[in-house]
Every structure is written in C-alpha cells, then in structure tokens.
Amino acid sequence: MILTGHALRERFQALDDFLVSHQSLWRPKPFTCPVLPWEAEHAELAAWLRRRSLAQADAEHNHPAELPAPAPFPALARRAAELSALGQLPSRELGPLPERLSVDVPGRKWQQISAFAERLLFQRQPAHWLDWCSGKGHLGRLLAQGGQHLTCLEYDPQLVEAGQRLSERLQLAASHLQQDVLADDAGARLTAEHSPVALHACGDLHVRLLRLASAAGCAQLAVAPCCYNRIAAEHYQALSAPARASTLQLSLDDLRLPLAET
C-alpha cells in the first residue's frame, strides 16, 4: 500500500515514537568505544553478539532481522520491519528507446535512471521537465523522449557542456544551464510549468528543490534523495509540521547511519 494523507502521518508518528523510545540502542556509534552504553541493560544480548565470529557477521550482514538473537532483539526487529515496510510503486513501460540514449552511461546508473523513470506516474502530463543537479542530463533526456521541453541545471560547467552536446546529438529541445542551485538566484530558474525531477540529490540540494518548487507553484515533482548528512546545519532541519513537532533531533552522525550500514 502506498502511504498518503492520514496513513502517512500515522506511520511517521509510529516510527518517530519507536526511534525516540529506543535511541539508547541506535545512537551510539559502533567501533568507537570498547563497551556500548546499552550492554549493561541488555547483558544477554550483548554477550550473544560478542560471541559471534567475523564469518557469522559477514554471512548475516544483509539479513540482520533474521538473527536468532536473545530479547529484546526479536521484538525490536519485527517492529522495525513493520515500520520500514513500503508499498511498491506502480510502473509503466518506457517503450522503445534510442540505443544512443544509454551510450557512455554506466550500467548500474542506467538501471537506476530507468527504474526511477518507470515509476513517474504524474496525474498531469508534464510539458517541461526540469532535471535538478542533472550532471550530463541522462535522466532528463530519457524523460523527454515524449517530446517535452527539458531544462537541466548543473553546477559543473564541463558536465553542462557535455550534456548539451549529447542532447543536440539526439535532437532534443533541451537547455543545459550552469547553476549553483544553492545560490540566491536559483529560484528564478523554476516556474509553475516545470515538472522537476532529482535523482540522488544529496542533503541540502534536494531540500532546496522542495522549497523552491513549492514557492514557484510547481504542481508535481519527483525526488529520490540521498546523503541526508550533507547539510550545512548541525542538525536535520525538518520541513513538515509533524516532523518539526518531534522531540527527536538528528545530528550529522545520526544522519550518517544509513551510509555506515552499507
């Protein structure tokens, strides 16, 4: 099930409560102190984990919820799995694409771009795509195969130039513009007609897009953020009212946890 409205707010509140209640378990950074602060309270679990061999840890690295560990681990693992479960977005067929479209794009990156594009099912047919922090604009060019206009914003002038050449080679109506999206003049690049997209926009970059797109009156956008720790502030700055009301304050170290897991 795709969470929206009241269901999304309920899930957020449950997840927030879970993280606040058990922050003594997840906040301490591993490998920074000989004994973790929670070991005295959960002595049996701590002893069990310390008996595990490196080979066992490597074998179970990608399936931590399946560990046959003592309490309170099983209950916490089940609840964490429930709260992190997400519905599968519907997808669409992209149709036949020019072979040149994926030239010079690493295979893994092209898979991510294609998977992102397949799940963009906007209620309104986009008339003008805006590829935020676009690099060479591979995502934007894929989306613009329907004949829509395309604007790509990128900070690196070499990527801007390379992207413009690729778009011209495919005869697309695309403009590749050099832009620092964190600069004061970035908002002038967005208008209500744009359908902004951002794939792997790190930290402040995706937050900046959300703010500017909202201010510009963009009716729809799609963002796949990453690297939440790459922000200028010392703590995460929430945008939604429920998140701002939370007592949980996430530091840069807290925001690095997903990266540490991988």
Q: Which residues does each predicted region cover?
A:
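Conserved SAM-binding loop
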Residues: 163-164
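Conserved glycine-rich SAM-binding loop
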Residues: 108, 133-135
